[in-house]
Amino acid sequence: VTVIEYVINDLKEDELAFHNPLHRQMLSEAAAHMYDSNFIAERYFLAHPDPVISKLSVDLINVRYQLSKYHSKSQKIVTDEERLYEMVPMLMINFKYAIVTEELKHMLYALQDPALAQDNEKCDSLMKRFNELKTVQSIMAKRLGDRVVLR
């Protein structure tokens, strides 16, 4: 399974999509080319005819930090490519965790609306959904291993 396939299937499974239209377009184009044997996403998007996508690609690919020569000489460096099998699932969970956290914030804001307090059915429904998402958030936090969910 390629990274593109994994990301597309993982997002479809949870009925998620990127909010940013550029990210959606890039994923859509990557999906269209994912079975092309000579398709290399990095090259494709860097040379994209749309300069905005090309610039975004540069920003996404650019390595922000470099390991000092002292450390790189004394130890074997494990590259991102070698760690894809562990990084991609973890990054997808991070992405979903951020979505769930944002949704919970919006729900809390909605629950503060006095008009909602007047409608018991809507309020109960929103509270039930809030509790479900809180449970999902807690499970995701445990899988990520380094998150503390405050109640």
Annotate each predicted stretch with a short phrase.
Residues V1-R151:
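Helicase-primase coupling helices
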